Each structure stands twice: as C-alpha cells, then as structure tokens.
C-alpha cells in the first residue's frame, strides 16, 4: 500500500518537545516567519538552491512510503554541501540551543539522509538556523554527520512511525469503507434535499463553486455534510463546515453524531475560540504562567494517540476534558488534533480571516480542503470586518501607562502620533470624522516602531507587570499593521474624533478579492448555502466575483401555510415615524387581538422600538423588549419564555439582531411576525462610502449598500415563522416601499400566498380567514 507522508509530519509527531511559546500563538508569527525565511534565502548565492523539493520512496513492512518535503536551502560552501533548515522565533537567540525544539533537528536529519542517499554522499553538513523575526539577527548550529549515522536515525524514525501508520491505516480503511456504504440516516429525503445533495456532491467532486438558495426545512446541514463526505476520495481531503453561530455548530455536530451512530467511521472536530476553550480563568499564553503551555509538546503525542483511538466526534467539551487529563492547552490541542480529522466544524474566520485562518490548511499544499459555508449571506459583512482594523489613540496612551518605567521608550512616538491625529482633526468638516482613499504610511511607521519596541520589552522582561494587558494592545497593533500591509483600492483610511479620543480605522468596503482568492485557489470545491441569498447575483459578485453556479430550491413546506400581508399605506421613513406610529400600533393590535398567541414585531432600530413602546398598550400580552447589550444567556431566557403557554408573549426585537436568525420557534411558539420597514441600514459615512464605491464599480451603489443588505434582514425575520411542515403563521410587512418593483422582485418564490391590504379592516378579515382555514391564496 502506497502512503504519502511529509517529512515534517514524522519529525513533529515523533520528536516534538518543549513549551508553547509566543512563536506558536498567532498568525502574525507565521507571516513574520515567512518574511524572515525569504530575507535569508534572498541572500543565497546564485548556485545555492532554496525550497529544494526532495522525495524518497521506501518499502517498510507492507507499506510503500513516499516521503517528501522542501529543504529551505541547499548551499555550496567551497567543495562542501550544506543543508540549511531555517526556523523563525521571537525569542532571544541566546536562549536557544540545538535542542530548543528537538523536532527541528530531527526534520533536518531526515532531509540529510534523503539528500545523501539521492546524491550518493558519504557525509554532509547540516545547518539549523534560527532567525529573530524582529531584528533578523541569526544564530546557527552546524553538524557534520555521516550518511551511516543519518541512515540509522532515518530508519529508526520510520520504524517508530510505522506503529502510528498502522493505527492511521486501520482508521483510514474504516473511513473509506463506511463512507461508501453509509446510507442517508433518515427514512425520507425531503423535497429539495435530494437536489441539494446531488448538486453539492457534483460541485465538491469537480472542485467547483455552488450557491444554494435553500429555504428552511430542506435539511441543508445533513444534505451538505452527507454529500460532502461522499465526495471525499483521498487521504488529504478535509471537509470544513463553516458557520457563524453556536446554534449552527450544534446542528452540524448532531448531524455528524447521527451518522457516526449509524456506522460512519470518520473523525470530526468542532473548533471553538481560544478564549472559550481556555482552562484558565484568564487566558495567559505564557509557559512561565500557564501549566497547559509549559511542556505542551512533551505530552502532545500521548494525548493525540489516546484521543484518536478513543473518540470519533471531538466536541469542545470532549477536547477540554482531554486537555485537562493531559495538562495541555485545549485550543492548540484542537488545532493539532484537527490534522487527524476528516471533518472540521468552525467559524468563518478560521478560513477567511488573515489574523486567524488556519495556516496549516490554507497556506500549505499538503491538504485538500473542501468548504461547506452555512448562512453564507453573512460572509459578505463578516469578510469586510475581517479585512478591516481599528485602534484607538487612548489604547496607545493606556499602553504607555501599563509599561510604567519603560513607557518613556514609546513617549516620543506617541507625541508624533498625536500631532498627526490633530492634523486630521483640523480637516474634519462635520461629524468629527475624516476619510481618504490612500493609507497614511507615516502612521504605519509609527505603529511599526511602537510594535517593535513593545515586542523587545516583552522579550527582555519575562516578569513585567501587566503582561497580559500589554499583549492585548500589542496584538491589536500587529493586527492593524497586517491589514495595512494588504491595503487596497477597496479600503478607506478613516480618523474619527470621539470624546477626546481618536479612532484610527482601516475600513474594507469590498472583501471579494480576498474571499474569492481563498475559494478559488486554496480549496477544492465550495458550497455556499442559505435561505436568504437574494438577489443571488449580489452575493455571487461580492463573495466569488460572479464565479460559480447556483440552484434555487423549492420550499418543502406548503406555501399556503404562510400568509404574507403587506400594508403599503404606511411610511416608516425616518421623517415620518412620529406621524405614522399610530398606524403601526393599529395594525399590531389587529394582529394580536384576532388570534392570540406569541408574536414578534421587528423594528429597524432600538429608537423606533422605543417610540412604539411609549404609545403601545395591550394588557393581555407579556411584552419582551430586546436590550442593546443582550447576552447569550439572556437570549436563551427570552427564547425559553416563549415556551410558556399560559400567557401570550409579544417580542419587540431589532431587525438583523440575534432573534432574526438561528432561533427555531416551532409549532405554536410563534403565530407570526410583524416587520416594520424594509430593513435599510442606517445612513452613515461607511454605508455611503460603500454606496459610492459600488456606484463606480457597478452603477448600483444604493442597492449594494442599502437595499440588498436590508431586505436580507427582512427575509431572515420572516423565516422565523415556518420552521416545520405543520407550522402555520403570518408575516405582516409594513412600509410603502413594498410597492416598489425592486422589492417585489426580491421576494422569495415561496412567498406565493401574499396580499396587499388597504386598511386594518382588510387586515382583520384576511387574518380571520387564514386562521379559520379559509381561502389562503389572497
């Protein structure tokens, strides 16, 4: 049996040692490491070779092993050949010796034998070089070693690794066999679900891009996961299920649990954030202060082997328990464990965010990831946020204070920064804000200098007070500089004056270049799905630059079970709200009094909701108004309150908030929703900058910045009503703009049972007819 293995895999599995240091804790480290590598390699002579690909085939037991890797440098020094392995670090070089991380030297020795064998050399010089990513200072360790010594190490390593290969191969056979034979876990495949599975399977098998408009009830989670698994044919393929909400993760976990219970033998892992997974009261990513970072690599192999042999589904709770048992960092353990898994459930940022994406999968050709992107309509705004950055001037002042006696080192830099910001303040015409299309490189230089000085302070003083607080601001600066490094025509540089503070922003108006690059060039097939991809061309353009195909699946639910009643006689525009609030109250009371039960009214803003509350009276309902700083715990409490059938509840929520999606009000939990307005985002500088940007690009600035994002929120809110085949309910849309043709065109196909009403009397008649089971076709 032929098996392909990376040399680095063998070295790290067998010989990894030491602590989790700052070198392992951020993508900034990895990016800086790449630049440091390139700096050294750029100094190579013409006859030297960099990133030298080497491959070796060897038969051991029943396995034909294909080992491969890239040697950082093959150098000629006189008549001597030197193999160089470069490792970057933030540590002081005097603290590093040749055994700093044993896996580094092991990797180099494996390369050494492969090169000697290929070139028939009796001996060779190995050079392990460490470069500091801040100063670019280097230290190196040379080892002159014979081919025979390397051969002994090489074969000894492979003999040890074969035991692990035996375990992996047994699980691999089980995975391949059960993926082939596993049947769909439900007796019945829903309407639309089969079409979605066929399209998803074809897309992932042919490395294409698919958008699926999949209404509620199709069973899109199981459809995509099942077809995604069926499309997996090779060892290095990994299926990523991306979702932005904890509820979405739970559904994906349960779908995989069901398949595993039915006999599927795959390894699946649900990844959660470092902050949520940390076993300490406060995250302290420092081996001097964290027992889970100290000696992490010394205990990692044992933990990996036990976990892999004992579990199929690694939920966050399972990972935390394993981490406690082996005294290792749960977050880093989950990342290392993910390399042994077939399916990874995670947030969008682990794929798309330059500050957090998983480098091991998306910057390395070793793996072949496939993407399933749930609630893909959220990716547009999420990606813009990922490629934006901001930092407050007061944070830099706070950094100065936290550094105490070392604060003077950045004092002059702070003064320079303050002078520049005051200059921008003088340019502000109104709204205390200034923007320009070009980034200010002088501000970049100041932040870069501050970053370098703080990094040096942290390196040289391991026991500095306020280390964690300093590190938080330090990484904010690092993140800001990283976004500045990829500043483009789609970014705007903004300075905002706010209560004697300055907010310095890099705002991304359009992230499609970045999302498309990842989907097109870093993965092998992508399915994006949501019930609210309207209009589809908007989402395709802003995620994959129009590339890909789409399917529009029919709702599995009887469209007559959802009644859409539209009151287009009321203006909800800002200037008219005081005048028309009584009309909204009248419509609301008609709905609430005609058929008592739980209802939700969605408003465009908290201020509009408060205006309604001031005048609204209805003693028969328990009113629950959403708070602006709603916690997850409070959100669940509100959801649970709707299950109390003794008293009807009226929820007053904000469009686009946590109650607009991801909450399943099944059965009698919700009779209907009233949606006030068309969901337009607030008119502000950022949205107007987007409008101007897309006007120049497509000539549809207002629609791209306001209309489409707004109506997506309307569709999401309306989607709370029908969550199962037996549900019946109503949606009331209130706004004169629903008469506009653009909104009529945007309405989903399953909104067939809709009617425009003339007055509250018409509204009552239609409601009575619907709830009594009368003519539902308007």
Regions found by a protein language model. Name each.
Residues 224, 250, 254, 326-343, ...:
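Signature of the SF2 helicase/ATPase Hel1-core->accessory helical subdomain module
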Residues 176-177, 183, 236-344, 352, ...:
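A substrate-engagement module of RecA-like helicase motors
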Residues 568-579, 628-739:
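Conserved RecA-like P-loop NTPase helicase motor core
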Residues 205-227:
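Walker A/P-loop
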Residues 171-213:
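Conserved pre-motif I regulatory segment
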Residues 56-152:
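Mg2+/Mn2+-dependent nuclease catalytic core
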Residues 319-344, 355-362, 456-571, 579-580, ...:
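A contiguous, basic/glycine-rich beta-loop/short-helix subdomain that forms a polymer-engagement track
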Residues 1-80:
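Metal-dependent nuclease catalytic cores that hydrolyze phosphodiester bonds in DNA/RNA
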């Amino acid at each position: 049996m032929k098996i392909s293995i990376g040399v680095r895999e063998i070295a790290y599995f067998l010989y990894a040692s030491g602590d989790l240091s700052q070198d392992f804790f951020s993508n900034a480290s990895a990016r800086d490491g790449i630049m440091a590598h390139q700096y050294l390699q750029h100094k190579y002579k013409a006859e030297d070779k960099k990133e030298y690909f080497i491959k070796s085939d060897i038969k051991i037991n029943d396995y034909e092993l294909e080992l491969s890797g890239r040697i950082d440098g093959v150098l000629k020094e006189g008549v001597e050949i030197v193999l160089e392995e470069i490792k970057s670090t933030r540590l002081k070089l005097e603290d590093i010796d040749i055994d700093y991380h044993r896996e580094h030297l092991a990797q180099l020795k494996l390369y050494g034998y492969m090169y000697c064998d290929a070139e028939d050399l009796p001996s060779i010089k190995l050079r392990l070089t460490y470069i500091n990513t801040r100063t670019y200072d280097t230290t190196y360790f040379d080892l002159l070693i014979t081919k025979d010594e390397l051969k002994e190490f090489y074969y000894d390593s492979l003999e040890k690794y074969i035991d692990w290969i035996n375990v992996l191969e047994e699980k691999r056979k089980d995975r391949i066999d059960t993926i082939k034979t596993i049947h769909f876990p439900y007796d019945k495949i829903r309407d639309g679900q089969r079409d979605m599975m066929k399209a998803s399977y074809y897309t992932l098998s042919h490395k294409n891009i698919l958008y699926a408009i999949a209404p509620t009830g199709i069973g899109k989670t199981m459809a995509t996961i099942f077809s995604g698994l069926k499309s997996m044919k090779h060892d290095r393929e990994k299926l990523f299920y991306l979702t932005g909400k904890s509820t979405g993760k739970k559904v994906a976990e349960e779908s995989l649990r069901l398949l595993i219970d039915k006999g599927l033998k795959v390894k699946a892992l649900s990844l959660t954030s470092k902050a949520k997974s940390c076993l300490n009261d406060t995250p302290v990513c420092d081996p001097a202060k964290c027992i889970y970072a100290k000696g992490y690599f010394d205990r990692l192999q044992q933990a990996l082997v036990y976990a892999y042999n004992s579990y199929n589904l690694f939920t966050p709770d399972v990972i935390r328990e394993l981490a406690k048992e082996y005294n290792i960092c749960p977050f880093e353990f989950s990342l290392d464990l993910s390399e042994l898994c077939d399916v990874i459930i995670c947030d969008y940022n682990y794929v798309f965010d330059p500050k957090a994406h998983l480098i091991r999968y998306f910057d390395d050709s070793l793996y072949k990831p496939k993407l399933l992107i749930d609630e893909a309509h959220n990716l547009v705004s999420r990606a813009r946020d990922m490629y934006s950055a901001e930092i407050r001037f007061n944070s830099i002042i706070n950094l100065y204070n936290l550094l105490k006696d070392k604060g003077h080192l950045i004092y002059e830099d702070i003064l320079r920064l303050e002078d520049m910001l005051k200059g921008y303040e003088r340019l502000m015409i109104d709204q205390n804000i200034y923007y320009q299309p070009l980034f200010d490189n002088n501000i970049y230089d100041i932040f870069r200098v501050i970053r370098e000085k703080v990094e040096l302070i942290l390196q040289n003083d391991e026991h500095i007070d306020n280390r964690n607080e300093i590190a938080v601001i330090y990484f904010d600066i690092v993140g800001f500089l990283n976004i500045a490094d990829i500043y483009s025509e789609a970014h705007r540089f903004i300075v905002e004056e706010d209560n004697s503070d300055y907010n310095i922003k890099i705002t991304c108006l359009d992230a499609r270049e970045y999302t498309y690059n990842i989907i097109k060039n870093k993965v092998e097939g992508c399915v994006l799905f949501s019930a609210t991809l309207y209009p589809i061309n908007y989402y395709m353009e802003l995620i994959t630059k129009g590339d890909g195909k789409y399917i529009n699946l029919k709702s599995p639910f009887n469209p007559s079970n959802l009644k859409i009643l539209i009151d287009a006689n009321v203006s909800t525009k800002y200037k008219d709200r005081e005048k028309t609030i009584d009309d909204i109250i009248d419509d609301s009371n008609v709905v609430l009094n005609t058929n008592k039960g739980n209802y939700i009214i969605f408003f465009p803003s908290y201020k509009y909701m408060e205006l309604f509350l001031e005048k609204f009276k209805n003693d028969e309902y328990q009113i629950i108004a959403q708070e602006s700083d709603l916690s997850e715990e409070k959100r669940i409490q509100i959801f649970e309150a709707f299950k109390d059938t003794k008293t009807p509840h009226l929820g007053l929520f904000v469009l686009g908030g946590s109650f607009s999606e991801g909450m399943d009000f099944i059965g009698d939990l919700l009779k209907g929703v009233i949606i006030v307005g068309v969901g337009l985002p607030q008119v502000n500088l950022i949205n107007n900058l987007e409008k101007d940007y897309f006007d120049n690009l497509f000539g549809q600035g207002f629609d791209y910045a306001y209309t489409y994002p707004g109506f997506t929120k309307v569709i999401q809110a309306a989607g709370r009503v029908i969550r199962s085949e037996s549900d019946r309910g109503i949606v009331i849309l209130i706004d004169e703009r629903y008469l506009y043709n653009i909104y009529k065109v945007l309405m989903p196909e399953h909104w067939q049972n809709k009617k425009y009403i003339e007055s509250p009397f018409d509204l009552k008649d239609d409601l009575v007819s619907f709830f009594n089971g009368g003519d539902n076709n308007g």
